[in-house]
Structures are given as C-alpha cells and as structure tokens.
Amino acid sequence: MGRRRRPRERDCAAQGARRHCRHLAECKLVSFPIGIYKVLRNVTDQIHLITLANNELKSLTSKFMTTFCQLQELHLEGNFLHSLPNEVSTLQHLKAIDLSRNQFHDFPEQLTTLPALETINLEENEIVDVPVEKLAAMPALRSINLRFNPLNAEVRVIAPPLIKFDMLMSPEDARASPP
C-alpha cells in the first residue's frame, strides 16, 4: 500500500512542480526547527511559500529571512510575533505576507522596503499608527488588511486620499477583536 500524503502536502503538490512549499502550520513550534535548514540547504532558493501559521512563534531569526530569500508568500498568522528582523528586507521577491492574529504594536516598517510586496495582512494585532506615506510609495502594493487594530483617527483621515490600494479598516467603533 502506498504512503498517503497529508492534505497540506497534496494541496501544495497540486500547485505545480515549479512552486516549492513548506507547510509547518499547527505544529506548536516555538522557533523554526534548526534541522530544517540542514534538510533543505540545497533547495532553499526553490522554496517560494512557507506556512508557519497557528504555532507559538515569538520571533523569527535573521537566518530564516536570509536563508529563504526567494520566498514569494509567507504565512505567519496566529502566532505571538511582535516584530520582524531587519533582514526581512532581503525578501525582495515576497508578494504576500500574512501576520494576522499576532501581537504587533508597531507596524513592521521593514515591509515598506519590499518592491514586489502586493498584499499585507495585519488583521487582529494592536497597531495604532501606520506609515501611510511609505505605504503609498510602495510600487506593487494592492491590499493591506488592518481590520481589528486600534488605529488612531489620524490614520483614518490621512490614508484615503494618499493611497491607491485597498486598505481594509474596521469602523471606528469596532476596535475589539471579532467574536
């Protein structure tokens, strides 16, 4: 009898042989496993999507960012992250990042330096202020989700006339997390 692949592996395989993915979601990880660096050392430049969603990560190392510098999608939702290492700026091919349901109090401004970034999801964090001018200058940005963050009134007033992308925000009175 052949070995059955888990659904996550099957979904990834269906995306095509040219797109390499690594799914480590819901594994109760508190850090990125060092052994993974060794196992993947010859193919890191071919990995375009990593999912570390719904773990217990409190931080990511600079080594993670520099090792997987060819990433196009990074899913980190549902962790305990409060910042990103400066080396996130090495992810020059990154198109989408999901940082929803983490513990960011400050907008991770390093993301504004990524030329290919199209989608940022920061829903359900504790972000008050957003660098609207820097976001407006991002050439590829199409969407940023800031729903369920306690955004200050200034962001709500300044952002709309400056931006040319979709900026999702909760109504002013809906600052609490969703039910």
Where are these regions (language model features)?
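The feature captures the LRR N-terminal capping module
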Residues: 1-78, 83-86, 96, 109, ...
